[in-house]
C-alpha cells in the first residue's frame, strides 16, 4: 500500500524502509525561486509565501517539506542571522539602533548599553534583487571576554509570549499541509554556528588553540542563550528541526572537529531531539572529512551533501558506504549547475543516477542539494521531481 508523504518521511526518520524514497524540494520561504514563481506576493508576507511553497511542491508532485524561518521566529530570527537580541529591551539592556540605506543595502548599527559596559554591532540586509534579501551581522558584537560576560549577564532571554506565538505561526501551515509532507523549522544553529554570529570567524577558527578559556565560555554561552527557543520550537508542532552546522565545515578537518567542536554540537542535537522530534544537521559546504564524525552527534539525519565542483565535495556513493545507515542522508542534486543551468536531459540523467546511488538500503531522502535559485527553469524542477519519483520505488 502506498504511503502518504508524511508517512514516508516519518518511516525514513525512524530508520525503516518506506514504499519509495521521499522526493522533496528545498525551497526557501523568502525570495529566490519562490519569488520567481510568485513575483506579486509581498516578500514580507511570510504565511502567504509558506503556503505557496506547499502549493507549488504539490503541483510538481513532490513530497512536501516546508522549512519555516521567515516570520516564524521573530525576534529570534534576527539572532539566527547574526548578532545579539536587539529587538528586546530591559532596564539593564538599552538598545539604540540607527538605520541607513543606500536603496539596496540597509545597515542597522546598534549600541547596547548595560550597567557593565557597552556593546556595538552592525547588521546588514542586502536586497540582491527585488524581493530577495541576504542577511548578515557585518560588525560582530563580541571581541573580548568582558564583552562575552556582558552578554551572559544582561542579554534578554526568550520573551514569555514567544512559545504561544510560534505555535500560532506553525499551526496554519501544519493544517494546510495535512498528510502531504512535513513541517520543518530552522531551529537554533549548533553552538559553533551561533558563536560565528557573535565573533569574527577568523578568530573563532583558531580560538580553541589560541584562547581555549574564551572558546569554552563562548561555546557554553552559545548553547545557553538558545536553549529556551529550541524547546519552544519543539513544542510548537513541527515534525523536524533543522540545525545549522556549516561554519565548522570539513576544511577544519576531522581531528579539530572531533576534539574541539563535536561535543558541543552533540549537546544541541540532544536538546533538539529530547522529546523524540528528529533533527537534520545542515552543512552546505565541504563535508567528506566529517561524514564519519557526524555519527557522534547522534542526529537522525544530515544534509545536503553538496556535490562538486562548485557547491561542495560530497561523493554520494562514498557517503552511503561510510554512513552505513547510522543516519539518514538527505541530498543532493546540484541546484545550480544541473537544475538551474542544465538542460532537461541533464536533470533527468543526474537525478536518475543520484537516486540509483542513494536508494539502496534506505536511509535516504532525495532533494536538490540547497535551495532553488532565482532563474531556475520550472521545467527542470518538474523533470527533477518526475524522474526522481519514477526511480524511487523499493
What are these regions (language model features)?
Residues 1-46, 113, 118, 122, ...:
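Active-site loop segments of alpha/beta catalytic cores
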Residues 34-91:
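Segments that shape or occlude catalytic/ligand-binding pockets
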Residues 48-50, 106, 315:
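Glycine-rich, flexible loop segments associated with nucleotide phosphate handling
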Residues 53, 106-108, 169, 200:
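Generic hydrophobic, aliphatic-rich segments that mediate packing or membrane embedding
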Residues 66, 95-96, 136-139:
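Short secondary-structure junctions
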Residues 81-95, 280, 288-290:
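Amphipathic repeat-derived elements
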Residues 82-86, 96-100, 192, 236:
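Intrinsically disordered, low-complexity segments enriched in polar/charged residues with Gly/Pro
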Residues 88-127:
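Serine/threonine-rich low-complexity intrinsically disordered regions
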Amino acid at each position: 500500500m502506498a504511503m502518504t508523504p508524511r508517512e514516508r518521511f516519518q518511516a525514513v526518520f525512524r530508520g525503516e524502509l518506506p514504499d519509495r524514497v521521499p522526493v522533496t524540494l528545498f525551497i526557501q520561504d523568502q525570495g529566490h525561486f519562490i519569488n520567481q514563481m510568485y513575483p506579486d506576493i509581498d516578500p514580507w508576507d511570510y504565511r502567504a509565501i509558506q503556503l505557496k511553497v506547499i502549493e507549488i511542491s504539490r503541483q510538481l508532485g513532490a513530497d512536501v517539506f516546508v522549512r519555516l524561518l521567515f516570520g516564524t521566529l521573530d525576534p529570534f530570527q534576527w539572532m539566527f542571522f547574526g548578532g545579539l537580541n536587539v529587538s528586546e529591551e530591559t532596564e539593564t539592556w538599552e538598545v539604540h539602533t540607527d538605520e541607513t540605506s543606500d536603496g539596496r543595502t540597509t545597515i542597522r548599527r546598534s549600541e547596547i548599553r548595560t550597567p557593565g559596559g557597552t556593546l556595538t554591532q552592525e547588521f546588514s540586509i542586502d536586497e540582491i534583487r527585488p524581493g530577495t534579501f541576504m542577511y548578515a551581522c557585518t560588525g560582530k558584537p563580541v571581541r573580548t571576554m568582558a564583552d562575552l560576560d556582558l552578554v551572559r549577564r544582561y542579554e534578554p532571554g526568550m520573551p514569555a509570549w514567544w512559545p504561544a506565538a510560534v505555535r500560532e505561526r506553525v499551526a496554519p501551515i501544519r493544517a494546510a499541509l495535512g498528510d502531504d509532507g512535513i513541517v520543518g523549522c530552522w531551529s537554533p544553529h549548533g553552538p559553533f554556528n551561533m558563536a560565528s554570529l557573535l565573533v569574527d570567524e577568523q578568530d573563532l577558527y583558531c580560538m580553541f588553540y589560541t584562547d581555549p578559556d574564551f572558546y569554552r565560555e563562548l561555546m557554553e554561552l552559545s548553547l545557553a542563550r538558545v536553549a529556551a527557543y529550541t524547546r519552544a520550537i519543539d513544542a510548537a508542532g513541527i515534525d523536524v528541526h533543522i540545525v545549522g552546522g556549516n561554519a565548522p565545515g570539513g576544511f577544519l578537518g576531522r581531528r579539530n572537529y572531533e576534539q574541539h567542536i563535536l561535543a558541543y554540537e552533540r549537546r544541541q542535537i540532544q536538546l533538539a531531539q529530547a522529546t523524540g522530534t528528529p533533527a537534520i544537521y545542515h552543512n552546505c559546504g565541504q563535508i567528506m572529512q566529517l561524514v564519519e564524525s557526524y555519527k557522534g552527534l547522534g542526529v537522525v539525519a544530515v544534509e545536503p551533501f553538496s556535490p562538486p565542483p562548485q557547491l561542495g565535495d560530497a561523493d554520494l556513493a562514498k557517503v552511503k558506504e561510510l554512513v552505513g545507515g547510522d543516519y539518514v542522508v538527505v541530498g543532493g542534486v546540484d541546484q545550480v549547475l544541473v537544475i538551474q543551468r542544465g538542460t532537461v536531459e541533464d536533470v533527468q540523467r543526474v537525478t536518475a543516477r543520484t537516486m540509483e546511488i542513494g536508494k539502496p538500503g534506505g536511509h535516504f531522502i532525495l532533494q536538490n542539494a540547497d535551495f532553488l535559485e532565482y532563474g531556475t527553469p520550472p521545467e527542470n524542477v518538474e523533470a527533477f521531481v518526475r524522474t526522481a519519483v519514477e526511480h524511487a520505488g523499493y
